[in-house]
Amino acid sequence: KKDNLYQVNFLDYLAMNYFQGCSLLLDKWIKDLVLKHYSTDVEHDYLINSIAASYNSMYFYNKPLFQYRLHEKNSIGAQYDTQTKEEHLQRANTLKIRTQNAHNALNVLNIIRLANSDYYQENQEEFSHMSTFFNQHIQALENKKFFELLCQNTSPYYSLIKTKKARVMDLLYVLKEKVIR
């Protein structure tokens, strides 16, 4: 709802950067944590928001605060406007793209382990299960394991890193790779 303030849950934010930092307000203690645990493995705005969310301190204010123009539609990510559907599908159908969210999630879990040890300790068993799943997911894609990927759809962790459409794309990626061989 417009003009509402929403708290962002850490798990909702785990695998991808929903909130770019073009308009971001943060407390000094978050800034200090981010600087202490800065890593080029995770984009800076993603890092800031992940750490804040792990402390239940990430909020989204659903109100445009200024115009951020990369092009006439006032949106970020202009490269997608210039891609054809075929170019987008070809780009999305690479191992790097198919495994990107799982790698992101593993990097964020590791950073949170260091930056918010209390949160990590409270959720250590869950973090361990997630890490295992994300690593198995990467391996299934790397090794073109169709049935492993299919079975992964029963895991609640898959929906943390992939939409249903992306899961279908994973299966198509593996099938395509098997057919080409």
Q: For each of these PLM feature ranges, what is it?
A:
Residues 2-81:
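Conserved nucleotide-sugar donor-binding catalytic segment
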Residues 41-42, 69-181:
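C-terminal subregions of glycosyltransferases and related glycan-biosynthesis enzymes
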